[in-house]
Structures are given as structure tokens and as C-alpha cells.
Design a protein with these regions (language model features):
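Rossmann-like NAD(P)H-binding beta-loop-alpha module
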Residues: 164-197, 204-205
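Glycine-rich flavin
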Residues: 1-3, 19-26, 31-165, 198-202, ...
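Conserved small/polar residues in nucleotide/adenosyl-binding loops
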Residues: 237-243
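Beta1/beta-strand and adjacent pyrophosphate-binding region of the FAD-binding site
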Residues: 1-10, 167-172
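Short glycine-rich, flexible loops that bind phosphorylated cofactors or substrates
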Residues: 15, 141-142, 178
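N-terminal Rossmann-like FAD-binding beta1-loop-alpha1 element of flavoenzymes
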Residues: 5-29, 181-186
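Glycine-rich Rossmann-fold phosphate-binding loop(s) that bind the pyrophosphate
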Residues: 10-11, 33, 174-175
Length: 244
């Protein structure tokens, strides 16, 4: 099988390039080892916003009396919230697949191996190409905390699919993803602590805005440990922090 363009990685860069090439009439093969859409659609922006919307509705229901609406004993089902999130993601993934298929892009699910600049192997098949485009994205960064390899910690992927409400949760890192999960689990009644090595959360944002957001999160009950590094991961429920 020979194609004018082979693309490895079906995230936003890969599938957009594949669609554009297909529209231009080129023969295209796209390799993706997980799901089309990449991290943002499957494990990032879209699923977290879907979870947060469910949490927002639950918050409204709990405080509905403020708006002269009676909602007795508002409750939630985390399993169904996660199922709804997965349904939304699947629908969007299918939408991407339909667009690519409409432009004759050949989609191959599996981990591709580059043999040389014009040859790729995947799933026991060999594919030849005139041009090769790499859009492989990124991997989850696990901070080099001593002992972390012996701890059954969560990554964002685990948090997205978790169906049991923990009593408490410590989040190492106060960036965008960390704060999204902090907000979500706090809304469900979980005691959340955010450990951040910088002097403010959301380091890439304006500091005044970050401080305002932190104050709002604190009102919801989130505890913050700023300018704090995790010294050691002892167990699933025990982190060692510096004493100051």
C-alpha cells in the first residue's frame, strides 16, 4: 500500500493535516494508536469540561433555593457522570472519523513503526509513503518525586475514569488540569489539597487573576500549599512535605 502522505498521530495536528491533504486530493494514511482527537479530546480539555459542567449543575441544584427553586436532596451519580463524559467524547471522535472518511483518508488504528523515511509498519502490514508527517504529541509527565514509583498514584487519565468518590484528594501541581480536577472533586464533597511548588497557582496566567481564582477556590473549601515541593511519596495516602 503506497500513499502520498503518511501521518503518525491522530490528534489536532494530525487529523487536521490529514483532512486538508485529503481535501486537496492526495492519498493519505493516518496512524493513531489510541483514539482520534488526541489528548485534548480524549483526555484533556473536552472531558474535563464535561465533568465540570455536571459539577456545575450539581452546585446549582444544591443552592437552587437562592433562585427560588426547590430541589430537595440534590444528589449525583459519579458513574453516570463519567459515562456521560465518555459518551460526549465518543460522539466527537466519531465526528472526526466521519470527516476524514469523507475525504478518503485511510485510518489505521495501532502503533506505527518507522522502518525508513518511506516505509512504515503497523499491525503486521507495511505501508509506503512519499512524505511522512510526525504528529505524535506528548506523554504524561510524572514528577521525579522519591518513592513515587512505589505509589499507586492517579494521573489525569485515572481521574477522568474514576467512578468512586474519595474522601480526600491531594493534587500535586496547581496548573490548569490540576485546578480543573480540584474544582470538580470539591463540588462532589471531596476534601482537596493542592500542592504547588510556585508561589501561585496557574503559573502561566496573570498573577492577579490567579490570586483571585485561588481565593474563589478557597471559598469552596480547597486547601492550598504554595511554594511547596513534595519531598517523598511514602504511600497512596502519605506524602512528605518540607517543614517551614
Amino acid at each position: 500500500m503506497k500513499y502520498q502522505i503518511a501521518i503518525i498521530g491522530g490528534g489536532p495536528a494530525g487529523y487536521t493535516a490529514a483532512e486538508a491533504a485529503g481535501k486537496a486530493g492526495l492519498s493519505v494514511v493516518l496512524f493513531e494508536k489510541r483514539s482520534l482527537g488526541g489528548v485534548c479530546l480524549n483526555e484533556g480539555c473536552i472531558p474535563t469540561k464535561t465533568l465540570l459542567y455536571s459539577a456545575k449543575v450539581y452546585d446549582y441544584a444544591k443552592h437552587a433555593s437562592k433562585y427560588a427553586v426547590n430541589v430537595p436532596e440534590a444528589s449525583f451519580d459519579l458513574g453516570k457522570i463519567v459515562a456521560r463524559k465518555s459518551k460526549v467524547v465518543r460522539k466527537l471522535v466519531l465526528g472526526i472519523k466521519a470527516k476524514l472518511t469523507a475525504h478518503q483518508v485511510h485510518i489505521v488504528t495501532g502503533e506505527a513503526t518507522i522502518v525508513d523515511k518511506n516505509t512504515i509498519q503497523c499491525g503486521g502490514e507495511t505501508y509506503e509513503c512519499e512524505n511522512l508527517l510526525l504528529c505524535t504529541g506528548s506523554e504524561t509527565f510524572i514528577p521525579p518525586i522519591p518513592g513515587v514509583e512505589n505509589v499507586d498514584y492517579w494521573t489525569h487519565r485515572d481521574a477522568l475514569d474514576n467512578k468512586e468518590v474519595p474522601a480526600s484528594l491531594t493534587i500535586v501541581g496547581g496548573g490548569v488540569i490540576g485546578m480543573e480536577f480540584a474544582s470538580f472533586f470539591t463540588s462532589l464533597g471531596v476534601q482537596v489539597t493542592v500542592v504547588e511548588m510556585l508561589d501561585e497557582i496557574l503559573g502561566g496566567m496573570d498573577k492577579e487573576l490567579s490570586a483571585m481564582l485561588r481565593a474563589e477556590y478557597a471559598k469552596k473549601g480547597i486547601k492550598f500549599l504554595l511554594s511547596t515541593k513534595v519531598v517523598e511519596a511514602v504511600s497512596y495516602t502519605h506524602l512528605t512535605l518540607p517543614t517551614t
